[in-house]
């Protein structure tokens, strides 16, 4: 799967979870691959598809922080099928950037697959940390 295809799949996943999604242009996106909105809250998302043994570094976090300012987003996230370096985690915490690594992405997919309705508007936990519903 290419990076562009990964971007599109993440966009579909956000839509499945009840978000309006806009894909940004391929070049000149200011560090955001997706702009997602729910209840007028805007979040920018940077997607990074790599080999699973690769670690996403600080540049992805820096890009999405810049993108949040450009797009007027209140929150930002980096989504990857791999993992993050410690430096990226530290920078993300300092800038309130959510990181969605391989394990979080798997949970997110499980929530989307198990959801018969969109996420509750009052959910305390972010959707990517929710426990998937039971399949009994």
Language-model regions, residue ranges each:
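Mixed-charge (Asp/Glu-Lys/Arg
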Residues: 1-30, 35-136
């Amino acid at each position: 799967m290419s990076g562009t295809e990964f971007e599109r799949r993440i966009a579909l996943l956000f839509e499945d979870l009840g978000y309006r999604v806009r894909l940004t242009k391929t070049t000149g996106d200011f560090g955001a691959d997706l702009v997602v909105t729910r209840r007028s809250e805007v979040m920018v998302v940077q997607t990074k598809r790599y080999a699973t043994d690769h670690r996403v570094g600080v540049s992805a976090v820096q890009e999405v922080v810049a993108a949040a300012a450009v797009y007027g987003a209140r929150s930002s996230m980096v989504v990857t099928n791999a993992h993050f370096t410690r430096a990226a985690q530290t920078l993300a915490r300092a800038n309130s950037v959510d990181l969605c690594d391989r394990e979080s992405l798997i949970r997110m997919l499980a929530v989307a697959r198990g959801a018969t309705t969109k996420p509750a508007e009052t959910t305390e936990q972010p959707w990517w940390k929710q426990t998937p519903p039971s399949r009994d």
